[in-house]
Amino acid sequence: MKVSALAENLRGSEIIKIAGEINELKRQGQNIANLTIGDYDSNIYPIPDELKQGIVDAYKDNQTNYPPADGVLLLRESVSAFLKNRLGLGYKPNQILISGGSRPLIYSTYLAVVDEGDKVVFPAPSWNNNHYCDLLKAKGIMVQTRAENNFMPTADELRPHIKGAALLALCSPLNPTGTMFHKKDLEEICDMVIAENKTRSANEKPLYFLYDQIYSQLTFGDNQHFDPVTLRPELKDYVIFIDGASKCFAATGVRVGWGFGPEGVINNMKAIVGHMGAWAPKAEQVAMAKYIVEEVKVNAYLDKLKSRIQVSLNSLHNGFQQLKADGFSVDSIAPMGAIYLTLKIDYTGKTTPGGTVLNNSADINFYLIKEAKIAFVPFSAFGTDDDVNWFRASVGACTFEDIELAIPRIKEALAKLK
């Protein structure tokens, strides 16, 4: 049946393909440690009790009609206070937009500042920027990053592509790597954006800067989150922040995200979100507004969540470092933030016991699913070249025990390759 050219040519998700393989094996009765999806198992990581009860209370209070187009005022006021208290960012409620999770905010940012044919610059690996470019018929410029920089882009890597671009889209802590910008590196990128905008006339669109910090509350050890506006306040007119409750409160299904930035851009995004009907449910907004200003309760929840996530990430990292020490061609980058660990499994060209040659990272992944009963996501799903044998491991849907038990299976599976 004939459909639109856009729908016909839109690329599917490699993660969904992997999920299909896992589901088929589960249907056959196999137990797979699924480290693919960037989500939480809510039986392992439930949302805060106070937030859950607040949602129930809001429904009992009949908070079930349409919310305001830009979000419930009480929530925008609470977000404003949350940003000031936790990140030192000063944004008024009229500079804040609420939506059903952060995804509509990213898409509406693209729609608000990018025209067909415009250049959008983003790093590889990164999450979904290539698909948003496809939807808008924008010219996506994927800048390949390097392991020695923790797969975070540098100003020197971005600079050759910035001239004339409409949008620079960055994320820290980064999905899929779980790594973060160091202060100096982000400062250099900020200075590059400032310099580029000084070359543009009043009749030209500036270079806008989308900064996704949905994982900003999930950092580990001495790793500190930095943002462009704190480092360079003169960027405030150009930076659109993406943030929300999904990751820091294990509330991916609650669907409350917030974006903030220049009032004019936010107003345009509000109209776009309204036409899409991508609002967050009103009851959830009311409950979130009350919860996020409870600083003691928020701190207690975050401390516990971060501690448990870090234990799982460290377990996987330490397991891979031991495999590396044992002579296996693997590596990992120490966890810095988010719920992800970056893994290297460099077995391209090896042959399985069944005689199949592993030609790329996808082949390696599907081999491990079948032989080691564990699933990752190759960086090729996030825009890197197929021959880059690095992977994302997401620990939010597995227990610490699942991860501990998986390491010996990985070792056994890799030892079988010739």
Whereabouts are the PLM-identified features?
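N-terminal small-domain helix-loop-helix segment of the aminotransferase-like
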Residues: 4, 8-101, 108, 292-294, ...
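Generic structural signal for small/hydrophobic residues in well-ordered secondary structure
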Residues: 18, 35, 55, 79, ...
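Short beta-strand
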Residues: 32-34, 242, 330-336
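Conserved core of the PLP fold type I
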Residues: 57-204, 216-233, 358-360, 408, ...
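Short, surface-exposed loop/helix-turn segments at secondary-structure junctions
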Residues: 273, 350-362
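PLP-dependent enzyme catalytic core of the Aspartate aminotransferase-like
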Residues: 81, 85, 353, 357-358, ...
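Conserved glycine-rich beta-strand-loop-beta hairpin in the small C-terminal domain of fold type I
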Residues: 303-317, 329-351
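Conserved core segment of the aminotransferase class I/II
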Residues: 52-53, 78, 232-310, 314-325, ...
